[in-house]
């Protein structure tokens, strides 16, 4: 079944790329990439990278392209070394009424700053994302924002803040019944205990993460 699904996605990708070269437009590719993003970020990334001259896109499309491309790279653990792309999306959406895109722009710029080891800037963007996150986006993003905040605080030796953020993520993932999120939150709590040389407590939480 998984092999068949991969084949279908691959065929869809080939047809999409062909459509692009045969006169299809960037708007279609952006919609297709967005629909594939959550389950197939590698396919979404391929579609986005097939868009020629993204700098010529209209304002909203260029901003969405920046968000989608950064999202795909983040999901595939591609390290970012510059904020120039996602900064355009933040500048475009920061005065917009579209809170979902505004939140995504701040969140993914925060992820880029975390990659760049600019923890102060990352924290500011994650906190801004929390301020504007709409209810319908909480399932995908709320726990992730707190987990990223926790990671930034831990890097800055702000262990109390890191622990608080991990516990917030833990509460959220329990309510959402997201087992994968719970694993990362519990493991994160253990990691913060380890950083504080509280090894017994760290071991307890690492064991909980494995259970």
List each model region and its residues:
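A "functional boundary" signal
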Residues: 20-211
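Positively charged n-region of N-terminal signal peptides that target proteins for export
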Residues: 1-6
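Bacterial N-terminal signal peptides
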Residues: 7-16
């Amino acid at each position: 079944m998984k092999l068949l699904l991969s084949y279908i996605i691959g065929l869809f990708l080939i047809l999409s790329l062909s459509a692009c070269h045969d006169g299809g437009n960037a708007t279609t590719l952006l919609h297709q990439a967005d629909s594939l993003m959550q389950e197939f970020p590698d396919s979404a990334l391929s579609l986005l990278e097939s868009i020629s001259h993204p700098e010529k896109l209209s304002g909203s499309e260029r901003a969405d392209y920046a968000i989608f491309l950064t999202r795909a790279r983040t999901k595939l653990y591609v390290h970012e070394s510059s904020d120039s792309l996602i900064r355009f999306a933040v500048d475009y959406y920061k005065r917009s009424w579209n809170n979902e895109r505004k939140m995504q722009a701040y969140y993914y710029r925060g992820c880029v700053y975390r990659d760049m080891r600019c923890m102060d800037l990352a924290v500011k963007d994650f906190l801004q994302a929390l301020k504007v996150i709409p209810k319908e986006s909480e399932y995908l993003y709320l726990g992730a924002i707190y987990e990223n905040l926790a990671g930034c605080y831990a890097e800055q030796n702000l262990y109390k803040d890191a622990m608080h953020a991990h516990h917030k993520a833990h509460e959220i993932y329990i309510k959402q019944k997201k087992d994968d999120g719970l694993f990362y939150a519990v493991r994160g709590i253990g990691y913060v205990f380890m950083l504080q040389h509280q090894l017994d407590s760290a071991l307890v939480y690492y064991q909980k993460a494995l259970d």
